[in-house]
Amino acid sequence: AYAEPLTVEDDEFSAAYAVMDDPTDESEHIYGTTYGARKALCEQEVTKVFGDKAINIRPGIITGTGDPTERFRHWLRRMVVGNEILVPGQDDLPVQYIDAADMCGWMVRLLEEGSASGPYNAVGAAEPYRARPLLEGLRDSTGSTSTLTWIPWDWIRKATTETPNYGPWYGSGPMPLMQVNNDRAIAAGLTFRPIAETAKDMIAKLDQVPVRDGRRGGFSAETEASLLEKWHAEQG
């Protein structure tokens, strides 16, 4: 629901709403144009009806056992397969995920308690994860023997024309979208299970949830192998 550019200093009340030139436009969602703006319009309608009793939850990247996207599941799938895994970008990249079970349980508690109101950024965890410790922790917790090879995006874009599906792992540097302030939600009781627990639950159901649009995460196996070979050859 936020307008760009979002900064890491922004909270629920300082960040600007995304807006649409024509609120009645019902054309296809366009991320960065109409998607967030429509969320903002929904919040405004809820607030009109419920006033100061309105609760508007603003999730970040949601994952969990029913997640049909590859924004988190890709890494688990690759670790189950094993072998060397290409990881794009910076190894200290901040990333935020929240387990749907944590978010939904908290939302139910807010309604039961009846004292909450206003907007809340439902993003996890208490502090943003960092890419390398997150993936290494997932690998170790799953018992995978995979190795992780970090390759800069600038090099990748020069080496291939294939457009991969890496979800929030795009870009050459940290993204404010992955560093959203969640202080208000935590103060209102939002808690987070260990990411390893989320991973364990998801791995048990990897093949039971169809991938959205049938598009697997990352590069094709052939491209990933080719890029890794080229990278190692250049690095000596």
Predicted regions and their residues:
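Conserved Rossmann-fold NAD(P)-dependent oxidoreductase catalytic core, especially the SDR/UDP-sugar
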Residues: 1-40, 48, 55
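Mid/C-terminal beta-alpha module of Rossmann-like enzyme folds, strongest
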Residues: 109-173, 181-183, 201-203, 209-236
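Short, solvent-exposed loop/turn segments at secondary-structure junctions
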Residues: 1, 61-63, 92-93, 127-128
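Conserved beta-loop-beta element that borders a ligand/cofactor-binding pocket
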Residues: 40-66
